Amino acid sequence: MTQPEPLVITLLGPTASGKTALSLEIAERLNLPVINVDSRQLYREMTVGTAKPTAEQRARVPHHLLDLRNPDQPITLQEFQAEAEPCIQRELQSRGMALLVGGSGLYLKALTSGLKPPAVPPQAQLREQLSQLGQAICHPLLQQADPTAGAKIAPADAVRTQRALEVLYATGRPMSSQATATPPPWRVLELGLDPANLRQRIQQRTDQLYSDGLVEETRQLSERYGADLPLLQTIGYGEALQLLEGTMNQAKANRITTQRTRQFAKRQRTWFRRQHQPHWLAPATELDQAMTLIEQHLR
């Protein structure tokens, strides 16, 4: 009798949907570590602004693929896959299962469908030029040159915008036309969270970020890596930086962070519904539902 392929469980959902709390419960039930698939949590020193699992949570359940690089060392999708795939394989070999958790849709899609992005090494000089141009110019440029990539990449996502332009410059072809896919040797069970009160949860998340020290973390990052660090233009950090520079007050920073987060969550929802087929878990009973689905897939 043929042995079934090992099982990869993915827990996905928009930001502030409760993935961290549920992932800890599932991980403890199954005695599994959590494999991070949140693109900003890959970077060191970005803890508060990315709502990275706390030291207490990481002591409770081991986490992989956190704090891989310094913030001034961008990680390409291909580099992330090179780190993530062996990590998944190790868990599958030792435990027969792996648990992926995150809201970065493209990163999840790459791991679950075997998407292979073009193998283009980083172009340091080009990245410097693009940083000098600024995201306000670079993203419209990408939309013109590669409309497919431009539609998928958020206007404030300088890291992925630069990467798409980098591939276009190096190969002469849009990044969106070069990706191929080879299905990985494992089964995938996708579990999704999308609570009805997400707007309220996002406001609470924003309040928590600022009370937990987002502004101080931003100040330290700016002093160490420079205010032009692309990751300091992402949600939360961009507003905290303007607050530090005196161009925005606290009330406006809070409001804009909440607004940008809600816009981002809307894009995440669209991506997950178009690119994935998760079992959407109902609030209040999500843990029981998740465990039932997992047990069914293990039979």
Curated annotation (Swiss-Prot):
It comes from Parasynechococcus marenigrum (strain WH8102). This is tRNA dimethylallyltransferase. It catalyses: adenosine(37) in tRNA + dimethylallyl diphosphate = N(6)-dimethylallyladenosine(37) in tRNA + diphosphate. It is an enzyme of class 2 (transferase). Residues 38-41 are annotated as: Interaction with substrate tRNA. Its cofactor is Mg(2+). Substrate binds at T15, A16, S17, G18, K19, T20. It comes from the Bacteria.
